[in-house]
């Protein structure tokens, strides 16, 4: 157990409080095994031994983690709180090293390639799908590129788009998506496989990554690095001029990426041309197809939530949190998102049609009680007269209905309120061996295929696809075993999500602890019976104004309206309202940022200036990132 030292010089050593804010008791800790006496604010690993009385335990310190003001120490603490594995066992590393050795000696299976000199020489989709796929297609003539963040190290997807002359099947666009063939290296039942299953996914923090696979694989053999031959599982999907998929084919292959592009570089090329656009002229075709796919997805009702995404700036030498900013979402991000969504859907449709067991990614329709609360709350806003709010008894609104509500609120004072309420009505997306819709994407059939380096569910989908194509003999998981694997993936995804939220709160506390007494503007981001949360305009960090700080009034809580109403003064606080607050104190051990109200405005604050340029999985490239920082939401579908 990790604890904070809150007082030294007790009878046994020091008095501590658990660093996990869910635990509420004190420990009298023996620190005789430590090399030096711990300081107040230091974090220790402690073994609890016996309960002395209510709220007090005895324990013995095993090791000091460091001072709480160090961001890296806070990351380590968060990892402990959520049982996130760190170092790989020696036998797993040995197995990975053997794969690297075999690849270096040329033992990796790159033989028997079917020739494909250039993309123009590619077989028509219908012929590829009927051809034998037990051997790899040579796709090194296709000008694939990877597009990722500037600090990405593992590249698991590469793309290429081209326009087609009028094809008899109606396809006028051709999307190629090549995904690292992790299943070639990580075999079922191997030590690497068991370790990857236990981890479930990679875990990303502002200054570190705990990968699902050893770096020999994640950043080496499997990573689609430029100018190196890499094994892939490829998808080729043809679309008509409305963005409707008409054809698809899947096959194992080998590619040679033509470039390691960044989102920022691609956006510059799309906006202004230049040298990169000259080297990769098909980027404009990719942009056009992405717009087409986005428009079609929105037309069917897919939900997008434009929420702020934090990027912490940490000095890795000192551990100091130097700042925080909202990530800017570019169309280049959305371009990759649309292509990954299209590939995921195409694979899910194919495997479903073939009757192959695999883990679906499902997102159930919203809970009826949550929807009822949502519609009652919206009925108290300026949207009250909208026909969209007419809901028959027992009716579940379609994704397109909820999307229309979001669109109608765009640019109004209710935009923030409506966006938050719709998001809170959503269920949790999860993996399941049983087919089901993805409500947030308005997709009847969906899976995760595009990130097998960092999500175990994707690796299972790759094995199912390879088996169905006859490229591998199996076995693949089915029945109860597939259910157990899906449940494990769900559990580890939840751990990753909770850890992400916790480290954001911890680093937010570190950033604010030296700014007590300062005044901030913000917006009410949550309302409870004991106070309301405020998200700062300056940074995506929340604090709380407790009702106990008001000495001149008594407040009643209206859950339907998400509102607090002053009994004596009539003063109101509701979701989305603009306020000015003063930071009174910060308790990092309890993850508390305490505020007092300074002033309000009468209307809800518009959120368009507070948010990133796009949205994502209330739906989600789910859980997993490709860089040392927060995973972009477009990676989470």
Please state what every model-predicted region is.
Residues 1-174, 183-228, 260, 267-268, ...:
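Charge-lined substrate channels and their catalytic hotspots, especially those that engage the 3′ end
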Residues 263, 268-537, 544-546, 551, ...:
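Append "with occasional cross-activation on large, charged helical scaffolds in nucleic-acid assemblies
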Residues 139-146, 150-168, 286-300, 502-521, ...:
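Phosphate-interacting basic helix/loop segments used at nucleotide- and nucleic-acid interfaces
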Residues 23-29, 68-78, 82, 172, ...:
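Single-stranded RNA-binding regions, centering on S1/OB-family and related RNA-binding modules
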């Amino acid at each position: 157990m990790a604890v904070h030292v809150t007082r030294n010089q007790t009878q046994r050593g020091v008095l501590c409080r658990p660093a996990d804010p869910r635990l509420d008791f004190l420990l009298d800790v023996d620190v005789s095994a430590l090399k030096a006496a711990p300081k107040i604010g230091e974090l220790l690993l402690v073994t609890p031994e016996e309960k002395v009385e209510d709220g007090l335990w005895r324990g013995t310190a095993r090791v000091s983690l460091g001072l709480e003001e160090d961001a890296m120490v806070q990351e380590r603490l968060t990892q402990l709180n959520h049982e996130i594995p760190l170092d790989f066992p020696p036998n797993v590393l040995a197995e990975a090293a053997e794969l690297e050795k075999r690849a270096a000696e040329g033992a990796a299976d790159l033989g028997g390639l079917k020739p494909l000199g250039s993309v123009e020489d590619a077989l028509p989709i219908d012929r590829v799908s009927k051809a034998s796929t037990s051997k790899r297609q040579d796709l090194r003539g296709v000008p694939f590129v990877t597009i990722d963040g500037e600090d990405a190290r593992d590249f698991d997807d590469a793309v290429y788009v081209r326009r087609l002359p009028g094809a008899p099947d109606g396809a006028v666009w051709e999307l190629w998506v090549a995904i690292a063939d992790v299943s070639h290296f990580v075999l079922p039942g191997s030590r690497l496989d068991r370790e990857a299953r236990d981890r479930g996914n990679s875990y990303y923090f502002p200054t570190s990554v705990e990968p699902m696979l050893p770096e020999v694989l994640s950043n080496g053999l499997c990573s689609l690095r430029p100018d190196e031959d890499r094994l892939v599982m490829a998808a080729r999907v043809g679309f008509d001029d409305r963005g409707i998929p008409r054809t698809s084919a899947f096959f194992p292959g080998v590619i040679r990426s033509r470039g390691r592009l960044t989102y920022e570089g691609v956006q510059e090329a799309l906006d202004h041309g230049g040298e990169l656009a000259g080297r990769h002229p098909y980027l404009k075709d990719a942009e056009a197809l992405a717009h087409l796919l986005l428009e079609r997805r929105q037309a069917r009702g897919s939900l997008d939530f434009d929420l702020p995404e934090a990027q912490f700036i940490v000095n890795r030498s000192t551990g100091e949190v130097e700042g925080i900013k909202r990530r800017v979402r570019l169309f280049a991000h959305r371009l990759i998102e649309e292509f990954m969504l299209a590939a995921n859907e195409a694979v899910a449709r194919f495997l479903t049609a073939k009757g192959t067991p695999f883990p679906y990614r499902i997102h159930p329709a919203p809970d009826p009680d949550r929807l009822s609360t949502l519609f009652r709350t919206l009925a108290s806003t300026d949207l009250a007269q909208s026909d969209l709010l007419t809901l028959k008894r027992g009716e579940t609104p379609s994704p397109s209905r909820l999307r229309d509500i979001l669109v109608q609120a765009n640019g109004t004072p209710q935009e923030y309120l409506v966006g938050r309420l719709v998001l809170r009505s959503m269920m949790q997306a999860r993996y399941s061996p049983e087919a089901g819709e993805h409500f947030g994407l308005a997709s009847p059939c969906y899976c995760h295929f595009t990130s097998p380096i960092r999500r175990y569910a994707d690796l299972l989908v790759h094995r199912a696809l390879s088996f169905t194509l006859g490229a591998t003999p199996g076995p693949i998981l089915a029945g109860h075993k597939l259910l157990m694997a899906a449940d494990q993936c769900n559990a580890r995804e939840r751990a990753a999500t909770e850890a992400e939220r916790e480290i954001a709160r911890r680093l937010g506390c570190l950033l604010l602890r030296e700014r007590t007494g300062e005044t901030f503007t913000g917006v009410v981001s949550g309302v409870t019976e004991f106070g309301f949360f405020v998200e700062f305009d300056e940074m995506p960090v929340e604090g709380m104004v407790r009702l106990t700080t008001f000495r001149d009034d008594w407040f009643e809580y209206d859950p339907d309206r998400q509102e607090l109403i002053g009994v004596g003064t009539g003063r109101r606080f509701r979701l989305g309202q603009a306020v000015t607050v003063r930071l009174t104190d910060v308790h990092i051990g309890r993850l508390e940022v305490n505020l007092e109200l300074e002033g309000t405005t009468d209307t809800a604050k518009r959120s368009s200036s507070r948010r990133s340029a796009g949205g994502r999985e209330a739906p989600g490239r789910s859980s997993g990132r490709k860089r040392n920082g927060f995973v972009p939401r477009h990676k989470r579908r």
